[in-house]
Amino acid sequence: MSNSNDNIWNNTEELNELLRIRREKLNILRSMGIEPYGIDRFERTNVSSDIKNDYENFEGKVVTLAGRIMSKRAHGKASFADIQDRDGRIQIYVKYDTVGEKNYEIFKILDIGDIIGVTGEVFKSKTGEITIRVTDFKLLSKSLQILPEKWHGLKDPDLRYRQRYTDLIINPEVKEVFLKRTKIIKAIREFLDNRGFLEVETPILHTIAGGAAARPFITHHNALDIDMYLRIALELHLKRLIVGGLEKVYEMGRVFRNEGMDIRHNPEFTLLELYEAYTDYYGMMELTEQLFAYVAQKVNGTTKIVYQGTEIDLTPPWKRITMVDAIKEYVGVDFNEVKADAEAVEIAKRLNLETKEGMKKGEVIALVFDELVEQHLIQPTFVMDYPVEISPLAKRKHDNPAFTSRFEAFIYGREVANAFSELNDPIDQKERFLEQLKQREAGDEEAHMMDEDFINALEVGMPPTGGLGIGVDRLVMFMTDAYSIRDVILFPTMKPKND
C-alpha cells in the first residue's frame, strides 16, 4: 500500500480538509434522499467466510452481506471495492448498468470506512478473486473519520490502545488476539467445570482490602458514608465459601491494584482464583500444569508454544524446585546454612542488592530470588516453599515452619500462577495479620489489613484446602505471543491525552 494516506496524519491542514469533505458528502447524500444513519436493521444471509470457504456451493447464488468499505477502485462505469465484516474481507463489483445511474452516483460518493449492505451474485473475477456482483446496496452508516492505512504511519504509539475500535478495523491480527482470548477463557471454564468446580461471583467493593499484598483503589459509599476498596484479590470471600461447604469454587473477574504500569502490569486486570477442599499445593501443581496444557491444546492445537522467539513446552510434568534450592542453583548461595537475619542481609549486600532496615531472613531470600533467579526460569517451573514472612495466607510446612506450602509457577522468567496449601489455623492467621498490621503502621501500604470476619470464618472451621491464582492476561500473552499486557486487554488503562 502507498504511504499517501499515512502522510495525511502528519499534515493537520490536509486532514482537516478531508474531514470537512466527508461532512460535506453527508449533506450531499441527504440532499439525494439518502439518510446515512436511517436504517435500523439489515438482514444478512451470510458472512464473508461462508462464501470464501465454500465457493463451489455459493457460485451463481444471490447473497446479502454487510461490511465496512476498506478499499475502493473505480474504472469508469464499473467499480470494485473490498468490504470487511466480522470474519474478513470480500470483493464486491458495482456496475453502472446493473445498479442504475442514481445508485452508481451514490456509490461513487461513498468513502473508505463507510458501512454498506450489498445483495448480489457470487462469481470469480478475471483474476480469480471471489466477488459479489452487486445488484443492490444500501448505506448503513457514513464514516466521518479517516481510517489510517497502517498503524506504523502514525506518530502516536499509544493511539492503537486509545482507539482500539480503529485498531480492530485496520489490523486483523489484533482481532485474532481477542478472538483467541475469548477461546482461552472458555477453555479455562470448560476445564474447571469438567473437574466439578462451581463458578461463583463475589463482591467487587470491599470494606477491607485483603487477599494480596497490593495498594488498593479507594472509593466512597455515599449511602453508608464509608470508604470502600475495589478488590485487589478474590481470595478471602472464596475461602469463606469453602468454609460454607461448597468445596470446589472458582471465580474469574477483574481486580484492581493502584500500582505501577509496565508491559506485565495493568491496574485493572483479570484474575482466576480457585479453591478446592481436601487437597494441598501439590494438588494445585497438578491442576495448574494440566490447565495450561489443556488450554494450549484447545486453543493452539499443541502444548508447545513459541513466545518472543523462544519455544516453551507446557507438557506436564513441569520442573519443581524449592526457592532456596533455586537460589543455590543460580546464585551459588545456600540459605539453609544461614541462621541469622543479619547474616542474610549481609549476603544481599554482597550481591549488590538494596536492602531495607530490619529485613528478616525470609524477606532477603525472596529479594535474592526476585532479583537474581526469576529471569532464568524460562521453561515452566514450580518454585516451592516460600518464606513465611511473604506468605501471610499460606500454611506453614510442618517440617520447617520458617517456610510455607506455597508455590509460584514461572514461564519465560515471569510469574504466571501462585498457590498455597491454605492456612486454616485461625490463631496462626490472626498472628500473621497482626504482624502485617505492624508493617502497615510502619508505612507499608501493601501489607494486609486485619479481617476479623475472615478469622471468624476460620474459627467456624475450614477443611484442608488448596488454592490457586492465575493472571488470565498473562496466560493470554503467552498463548498469543503478545509482548505487552496492553496487547491482550481491549481497553488498557491510559493517561488522558490532554494531561
Curated annotation (Swiss-Prot):
Source species, domain of life: Bacteria
Reaction it catalyzes: tRNA(Lys) + L-lysine + ATP = L-lysyl-tRNA(Lys) + AMP + diphosphate
Keyword entries, A-Z: Aminoacyl-tRNA synthetase, ATP-binding, Cytoplasm, Ligase, Magnesium, Metal-binding, Nucleotide-binding, Protein biosynthesis
GO CC, alphabetical: cytosol
One protein family per Pfam: tRNA_anti-codon
GO MF entry, a single one: catalytic activity, acting on a protein
Binding positions (Mg(2+) 2): E415
Cofactor(s) required, per the database record: Mg(2+)
Record bears the keyword Transport: no
Keyword Nucleotide-binding applies: yes
EC number: 6.1.1.6
Cofactor note: Binds 3 Mg(2+) ions per subunit.
NCBIfam families the record matches: lysS_bact, PRK00484.1
Protein name: Lysine--tRNA ligase
Lineage: Bacteria, Bacillati, Bacillota, Clostridia, Thermoanaerobacterales
Designated gene of the protein: lysS
